[in-house]
Regions:
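Helix-biased detector of long, well-ordered alpha-helical tracts
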Residues: 1-275
Length: 275
């Protein structure tokens, strides 16, 4: 069974009404958790300890941002290999703590275990009165993505070839669109962050809403199959196009409208981006 099918099979078996978004919404509180595992999401020889800590925190905060929520608290589980030094542990925790504070989030506890590899799992508790969900699409809605996609996959391929990439690479340090999401929220119908690639995440949104799409122009595989971008995939009604684009300009957020929602079964061909 392909990775995406196994993931959906597990989710379906949970049987909870709270499952299906970037975070579980319980009242005005949102709960989310993401793993960041060595040799699945990163290789230690590719990144400094500080970069590992920062990205682990960013990809978790991204779930809150994607749902128009304010991150409040973080709980961290870390599996520490025997070769990690105390100085490296300090560097890891300082990086995560500083990154969390950038978004108004406080680390309040967690757990540590010994292991063969460096694994991190972070739970974020956030709050929102108007969460942005994946559900709610309507026929004719426009589908758009923020940022310039493709850089994460391009740099990942370079790392595989043994090349160096820039310290500010999206693969190391993704950009979260908190200002855009907060200001555009009244006009947005649905949203999610792009973690598995534009193609796969578009399919997820269409599947949960039982719609298809019409593409305005072909999206290249280099863009659509680039995972771990952590940009936003959003939808909105056509009549809000000008206002949404104005907010994108005001928040310095590149925004590309690439498709519209339709009553068909069309889907992108996609695959997992993990190793």
């Amino acid at each position: 069974m392909p990775k995406q099918d196994k993931e959906q099979y597990l989710i379906n078996n949970l049987g909870s009404k709270y499952v299906g978004d970037d975070a579980a919404v319980v009242g005005d509180t949102l709960y989310s958790m993401d793993a960041f595992f060595e040799d699945t999401h990163f290789k230690r020889e590719w990144m400094s300890i500080a970069q590992i800590g920062r990205k682990a925190m960013l990809i978790n905060i991204s779930d809150a941002i994607a749902m128009n929520a304010q991150p409040k608290f973080a709980l961290i589980t870390v599996s520490l290999p025997h070769d990690v030094t105390e100085d490296q542990i300090d560097e890891l925790m300082t990086s995560m703590d500083n990154t969390a504070k950038e978004y108004g989030c406080e680390i309040i506890g967690g757990d540590t275990i010994g292991g063969d590899k460096l694994h991190l799992s972070i739970t974020i508790v956030s709050q929102s009165d108007t969460p942005l969900l994946r559900t709610g699409l309507k026929e004719g809605d426009l589908l758009a993505y923020t940022g310039v996609l493709g850089g994460s996959k391009r740099d990942l391929d370079a790392l595989y070839r043994g090349e160096k990439i820039a310290d500010d690479s999206r693969f190391f340090d993704p950009t979260l669109r908190a200002d855009f999401v907060a200001k555009a929220r009244p006009l947005l119908r649905t949203g999610m962050d792009i973690s598995d690639g534009l193609f796969c995440d578009t399919n997820k949104m269409l599947d949960i809403n039982k719609y298809g799409f019409h593409e305005f122009e072909k999206v290249d595989d280099e863009i659509g199959l680039s995972g771990e971008e952590f940009e936003m995939l959003v939808s909105f009604a056509p009549e809000h196009y000008s206002d949404v684009m104005q907010i994108a300009e005001e928040t310095n957020t590149p925004l590309t409208v690439y498709a519209k929602v339709a009553k068909n079964d069309d889907r992108y061909t996609c695959k997992s981006h993990h190793f």
